[in-house]
């Protein structure tokens, strides 16, 4: 069976209603985890009624209650199977993140990929030796490590990251302070704006992959709606 699906229709034909009904049915009659990437803030009321967790990502870093809400793109999940390498998977994600931040049609050059991978391994080495969540690396740690590298490419990458570390778009330079283990989680990304929306969607995808990896070992499904 194909695990993917589309809900198609003309505007006003009930696509959102159909999705909400499907989510509700899955929530009530299965034990599947449900994660929603919500670009239009359509699903938060349903999620709240079902006792789920709504995470509003915005440039200000404030949730629906006005309190800070952060999701750390550097979060690393160590609960992988023996066949997976958590550090290699996280390095691959960080490469995708840097490629999105730097932009350009050609993407990252081989030397840039090597520099980023080296910096990622250096940043996570202390954490992997003592995996304390309070010491989870953040983007600022990667930025500082890149500045230590001798290659000029490292300086270029760090300069591109600066906007997201100490600049006005630094919402993702914080440790995660929201509960992500709820069975029903909705990521409201409507307020992220043009500059942050693609980055926000990539980070949500990484959080989904973390959940899928954990659930795979438990023989539990994870449904993603976006």
Model region roles, listed by residue range:
Residues 1, 44-53, 57-67, 72-224:
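P-loop NTPase motor domains
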